[in-house]
């Protein structure tokens, strides 16, 4: 800038890629580097910089999803719980990541609470949703377009979708399916997410799924069985 300080250079993208949440001890663990020059990598303790593991990258290959040439390094055999980063020369360091058994507890809660924050047709409270809190919304009846009789139906409820106020049966049904699968696999006892229904002796995953299902039933035409 004329007469001012020079702007700092833009930050360089991290070239050493890991799962930033981390890995369970027995998970397959892979590091990816977007450079042809890196041959080896080392895992260092994030607090002490002590080298904990040394590994080698495989051959350079094209990753279609990344649209880039990459090299993969495997560190599955390293299982020690802790917080680490990977140093790779000449590309630099990865973000910090962890190895442990409870890594996904907070992620699970964040995902399900996100659905609560997207609830439509009810107050979403600040003590649970923070900045996403809002009053009950979209409570008015909606016109069925294409129906010449002027039919209006109650479509309150469900989840807002995709960062706006749209609500859709198809994407809602897929999300409900995912909640049911998560319940079958992991969630029979999960009743501590802090949503209004918590503590009602029904797992919170099912409570959240029911909130969407109640809306989906409103979206079903009684005569044809089809959905709006």
Which functions belong to the PLM regions below?
Residues 1-2:
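N-terminal Sec signal peptide cleavage junction
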Residues 5-12, 16, 94-129:
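Low-complexity, Pro/Ser/Thr- and charge-rich linker/hinge segments at domain boundaries
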Residues 15-102:
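Ligand-binding face of N-terminal immunoglobulin V-set domains in extracellular IgSF glycoproteins
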Residues 38, 70, 81-83, 94, ...:
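Extracellular structured ligand-interaction cores
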Residues 65, 77, 93-109, 189-208, ...:
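Acidic/aromatic-lined carbohydrate-recognition and catalytic surfaces
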Residues 88, 176-197, 212-219:
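Well-ordered alpha-helical scaffold segments within catalytic/enzyme domains
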Residues 110, 114-171, 195-228:
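Extended ligand-binding groove/face enriched in aromatic
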């Amino acid at each position: 800038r004329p007469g001012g300080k020079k702007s700092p250079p833009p930050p360089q993208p991290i070239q050493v890629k890991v799962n930033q949440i981390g890995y369970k001890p027995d998970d397959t663990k892979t590091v990816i580097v977007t450079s042809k020059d890196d041959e080896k990598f080392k895992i260092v303790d994030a607090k002490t910089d002590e080298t904990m593991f040394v590994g080698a990258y495989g051959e350079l290959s094209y990753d279609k999803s990344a649209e880039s040439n990459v090299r993969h390094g495997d560190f599955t055999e390293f299982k020690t719980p802790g917080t680490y980063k990977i140093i790779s020369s000449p590309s630099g360091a990865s973000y910090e990541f962890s190895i442990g058994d409870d890594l996904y507890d907070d992620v699970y809660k964040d995902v399900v609470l996100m659905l609560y924050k997207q609830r439509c047709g009810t107050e979403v409270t600040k003590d649970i949703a923070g900045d996403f809190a809002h009053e009950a919304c979209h409570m008015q009846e909606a016109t069925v377009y294409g129906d010449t009789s002027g039919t209006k139906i109650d479509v309150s409820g469900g989840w807002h979708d995709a960062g706006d106020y749209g609500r859709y049966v198809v994407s809602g049904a897929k999300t409900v399916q995912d909640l049911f699968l998560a319940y079958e696999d992991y969630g029979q006892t999960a009743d501590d997410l802090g949503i209004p229904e918590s503590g009602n002796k029904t797992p919170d995953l099912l409570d959240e799924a029911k909130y969407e299902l109640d809306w989906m039933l409103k979206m079903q035409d009684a005569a044809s069985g089809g959905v709006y």
